[in-house]
Amino acid sequence: MFNPLYLIRVISCLFLMEIILSEASAKNYNDENILLMDITQINETLDTNEDPPVKRVVIKLFPEVAPKHVLQIKTLSSEGFYNEVIFHRVIGGFMAQTGDPTGTGMGGSDLPDIRAEFSDKPFVRGTLGMARSQHPDSANSQFFICFDNASFLNGQYTVFGEVIEGMEYVDNIMRGEPPDYPDKIVSLKPSIDN
């Protein structure tokens, strides 16, 4: 005997499974221009003796906008260069800067500096830009993530990517120049290496 209620339940279950599976596959990034950055969240355990939690930030790179910068970031992240590197300069309402293994803001990688690749991409909340000295062609390994719009940087620094997931964790990075208890990158790697 046909039971229409049973059919409705089966269809509902199948629909729910489809939603769950599509959300799970959306989180399974497998793209050479996606980076997975795991960062600490010191302020969640500042008053305890516990290790800080590690949170994931997903970054989309812009090879069509800044091919040399993207290549350098991908090369360094594939080598593990950014692992355990602190956020050494974090200014509320502006940005969080990292990428210097010395933690001073004066260091970089052994790779050559990169020529500027300025574009019309604006610096907005979640934008990743390359840090540099006053010389436009001095970017190397240091980069920053904007907390908010920073239009005064437009055309002055190279935009190479954006945060597409986990911006709430970037917002939670400890402030300071340098912070008393700096957060760090635990791991930064291309999603295809995951």
Regions of interest found by a model, annotated:
Residues 1-11:
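Bacterial N-terminal signal peptides that target proteins for export
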Residues 2, 21-194:
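Cyclophilin-like peptidyl-prolyl cis-trans isomerases
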Residues 10-19:
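Bacterial N-terminal signal peptides
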